[in-house]
Amino acid sequence: VPDPERIRSIASSFGWLDARLLHEGWLGRLGPEALGVLVFLVLAADRRGASYYGREKMARILGVERRDLDRGLARLVELGLVAHRRWSQHQQDGVWQVLPVPDRGPGDRHGPSPEDHDRRLPETLAAILSKLTR
């Protein structure tokens, strides 16, 4: 240990991340927005994994644009790492719950990774342009 005099100890309140996020490839599937939001939700969660922060406040605390926060939240829900229940039908905000890491790895979940989107972008643009020039 580089600094044995300064070993961390658990304070009165703490959050924890399942090590399977690292060892089973989840981190690479999240993308930076979702990873930042997941860390925030874990730190803000109560013992049931629930957090009651609104989207505007989360974005402000994280120092990100609202659209980036929304993209991160959507990715977490898509991968089954977070659940959401709205306060009402007419409000986007509500309760966010950090869920246990699914038993099957992220490669088994539906939806391409952010890297997959980046790799396919040139192909998608080429297909659109070829249709326009016909």
Residue ranges and their predicted role:
Residues 15, 43, 65-67, 105-107, ...:
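Intrinsic disorder/low-complexity signature
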Residues 60, 78, 87, 102-134:
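Short, low-complexity, charged/polar intrinsically disordered tails
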